[in-house]
Design a protein with these regions (language model features):
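Canonical tetratricopeptide repeat
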Residues: 62-65, 93-94, 128, 162, ...
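Alpha-helical segment of the N-proximal tetratricopeptide repeat
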Residues: 21-48, 52, 62-65, 69
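Alpha-helical linker/edge segments of TPR/alpha-solenoid repeat scaffolds
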Residues: 106, 173-177, 189, 201-226
Length: 262
């Protein structure tokens, strides 16, 4: 939550912290209270801002966020849908998520798609469309959404993470190594990074077999399809890309780009 607050404040406070207004400072304290789980105090601070400035974007957005965190999704929708800010993708993301959690997945998808029409390079919105496709077992569509999100917004780490996890359940786990390493280089020191490190280690363990003193068998790429719960989707890569992909993954985190086996 602190990260999203900094992003919001940057819209209003360009340059130095001294540019922040007392209202911004109260909103910042409200987010700190949310981080601490003190939702009542966060609500009080936000209400004090809105009493003086009912159209304050930050205060309204954070109020919607607070309601979402409290699992009051219908109320979050009512607050967020009143905010008029076409150029801020996180607003569409949060509103869409609130619709989805309130049980209106169709409206959630429309919200993400509307946000992308206004902000075509919003990788976070492709991420949410991919997540819905994944939840509905439309794995080919999920793959396309995550890849598009990584293409238009390469600095947003979550699409790389989702791609790595999707390929981890496929017969092309070589791409788990590539996307996973990219994710870990963008997002460092988080719980998600630790989990991805474990995923990569497991991918190596599951796909490298020592078959003798001088023989190693690698099975990172097999038949170009992803399988999950009996469903399959086509992957536009085959075994020919293994060497390039493996080198990219191995060099991304300082591991030597060539290996010599005795």
């Amino acid at each position: 939550m602190k990260t999203h607050l900094l992003a919001l404040l940057s819209l209003f406070c360009i340059g130095t912290a001294s540019a922040q207004t007392p209202r911004d400072e109260r909103i910042a304290r409200a987010v700190e209270r949310m981080d601490d789980g003190d939702y009542d105090e966060a609500a009080r601070l936000l209400e004090s801002v809105l009493a003086a400035d009912p159209k304050n974007f930050l205060a309204n957005y954070e109020t919607g966020y607070l309601l979402y965190m409290q699992e009051r999704y219908e109320e979050a929708v009512e607050v967020l849908r009143r905010i008029k800010r076409k150029d801020y993708p996180p607003l569409y993301q949060l509103l869409g998520n609130a619709y989805d959690m309130a049980g209106d997945r169709k409206r959630a998808v429309k919200t993400y798609e509307k946000g992308l029409r206004e902000n075509p390079d919003a990788g976070r919105l492709y991420l949410e469309l991919g997540n819905i496709a994944y939840a509905e077992r439309q794995y080919d569509r999920a793959l396309a959404c995550y890849r598009r999100g990584a293409t238009v917004d390469p600095a947003h780490p979550s699409n790389y993470r989702s791609l790595a996890l999707l390929y981890a359940i496929s017969t092309e786990p070589v791409w788990t190594l590539v996307w996973g390493e990219l994710f870990m280089n963008l997002e460092r020191g988080s719980g998600r990074t630790s989990a991805m490190s474990e995923t990569l280690a497991r991918t190596y363990r599951d796909n490298i077999r020592i078959e003798g003193d001088t023989a190693v068998r690698m099975t990172f790429s097999r038949n170009g399809r992803v399988a999950r719960e009996g469903l399959r989707l086509r992957i536009p890569f085959g075994t020919a890309v293994f060497e390039v992909a493996a080198r990219a993954a191995l060099t991304a985190d300082g591991i030597p780009d060539s290996l010599t086996l005795d």
